[in-house]
Regions:
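Hydrophobic residues positioned within well-ordered beta-strands of beta-sheet architectures
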Residues: 23, 32, 109, 122-124, ...
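Acidic-aromatic substrate-binding/catalytic surfaces of carbohydrate-active enzymes
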Residues: 28-85
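Extended, loop-rich substrate-binding clefts of extracytoplasmic carbohydrate-active enzymes
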Residues: 84-129
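Short acidic/polar mixed-charge low-complexity motifs
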Residues: 28-32, 40, 49-52, 118-120, ...
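Active-site/ligand-binding surface loops and adjacent short beta/alpha elements
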Residues: 143, 151-222, 227
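Beta-strand/loop-rich accessory regions of lumenal/periplasmic or secreted enzymes
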Residues: 62-90, 98, 163-177, 198-201, ...
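Acidic, contiguous internal or C-terminal segments within carbohydrate-active enzymes
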Residues: 111-154
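Beta-strand-rich recognition/accessory modules
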Residues: 1-28, 35, 112-116, 193-272
Length: 272
């Protein structure tokens, strides 16, 4: 159930989907939706694109305090299950839209995460042109991990390749480091953490006839994930066929106060 809360501009609307407030952008550069819970980009469809760049679960219930399955969750201030809740608290908390600027060829949205004492703990900036850039800035006193957990929308898992990856990774499913091809095809469940070598990763999608470029800024790791048939919560049994996660992460060299991590995402001519 969707209900309008506030019309901020002619191109920017605050709505509520079930229990979650969501910003909807309809602008000449493209369309996007951002959940205020987690400052989580849910969808982005740039001008002229036939398909959304990001995958969002068809059965996502939008329940407050429960992680949203899809888009670009912000895993922060820790990654994985080293503490609870898994992947940190930022994706479960409400952020505030603190600034926005809509120009003819560019949109900038900024979100702030406040502590219970009103102190800013983190900021997230999203910039939309023909590219989408997401920047998370750490403003906490303690060093932190972060990952931009991007779920990419794909035509069919059997028709993609992830290119320009390192040739070794830590395989979380096997619990060990292993050698892998630099170009990965996904034919079973995968959960690999790579030490960043090249700042660009490419997702080639034959079914959608497109190539997505992910440029990793101020990151030290890339995470490649697809659950295959071990379906997590809020995902259809065959949902794994239409998504793959390529995450921009800072896991080893912790973020210090004022440091940022960002992912720049663009579509390229389908050289496939």
């Amino acid at each position: 159930m969707t209900a309008q809360i506030q019309q901020l501009t002619s191109e920017l609307t605050l709505e509520r989907i079930n229990e979650i407030p969501v910003l909807t952008l309809n602008h000449p550069v493209g369309s996007a939706r951002i959940a205020l819970q987690g400052a989580q980009l849910l969808n982005w469809q740039p001008k002229g694109a036939e398909q959304d760049i990001f995958w969002l679960s068809e059965i996502e219930p939008f329940t407050q305090g429960v992680a949203i399955r899809g888009g670009v969750p912000l895993c922060y201030p820790w990654f994985g299950g080293v503490k609870q809740p898994s992947h940190g608290t930022a994706r479960l908390r409400l952020w505030k839209l603190s600034d926005y600027d809509l120009q003819a060829n560019e949109v900038r949205l900024e979100f702030s995460l406040f502590s219970e004492y009103g102190v800013i703990e983190a900021k997230t900036k999203m910039e939309f042109t023909d590219k989408c850039t997401i920047t998370l800035t750490h403003l906490g006193q303690e060093p932190a991990q972060a990952a931009l957990h991007s779920y990419f929308n794909i035509g069919d898992i059997s028709q993609i390749e992830v290119q320009n990856l390192p040739s070794s990774c830590y395989d979380s499913l096997q619990g060990k480091h292993t050698d892998v091809p630099s170009t990965r095809k996904i034919e079973q469940g995968v959960d690999c953490i790579y030490t960043l070598e090249e700042d660009k990763t490419f997702l080639v999608d034959k079914a959608f006839n497109r190539r997505i470029q992910i440029t990793h800024h101020h990151a030290d790791s890339i995470v490649l994930w697809n659950p295959w048939e071990k379906t997590p919560s809020a995902m259809k049994a065959d949902g794994y066929r239409n998504m793959v996660c390529i995450e921009t992460a800072r896991l080893e060299k912790l973020l210090q106060f004022g440091e940022s991590i960002s992912a720049e995402i663009s579509t390229l001519p389908a050289d496939i």
